[in-house]
Amino acid sequence: MSARCGTIFTTFAATILLLSTVGGATPHYIWNASNSVPIGLYRVQPATQLTVTELVAVQPPDLLAAFLDLNGYLPVGVPMLKRVLALPGQTVCRNGLTIAVDGIDMGQAHERDGRGRPLPVWQGCRVIAGGDIFVMNWQCADSLDSRYFGPLPASAVIGRAVAVWTDEE
């Protein structure tokens, strides 16, 4: 997808989000324009309990949102669609570029993004604390997720994302 098309789709996604959140309500639909999960329309439903592998809509915390916006990855206010990879009590490790959960290799991080810019790095093992989650789209090697920015507060989860229509259908 060209950068121009990506910008148009991201703007469309932000518009849908803005229109769906008027009055403080949880957004009901999100248009995903990234390749991290299939491109398409997703319905956001309440998630009372999260499970590993579940696809969720996440509103990045302020510092992460500013980083994503400043670097042109995602405008402020637009949620990300990510899979839950680890929940409280699970151990997540980054050893070099390898991400492992409870001793099982789940994927690789990259040193640089598609434009050649260095990506955030953390190393070592972390037990996911109560109130946190680790999100990673392991099926997409280029996904910008917890393999770079670490665990997120579970409160950042807007809800469960269910595909309504995607380009894979």
Label the model's feature ranges.
Residues 1-169:
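Extended hydrophobic leader/signal-anchor segments used for secretion and membrane insertion
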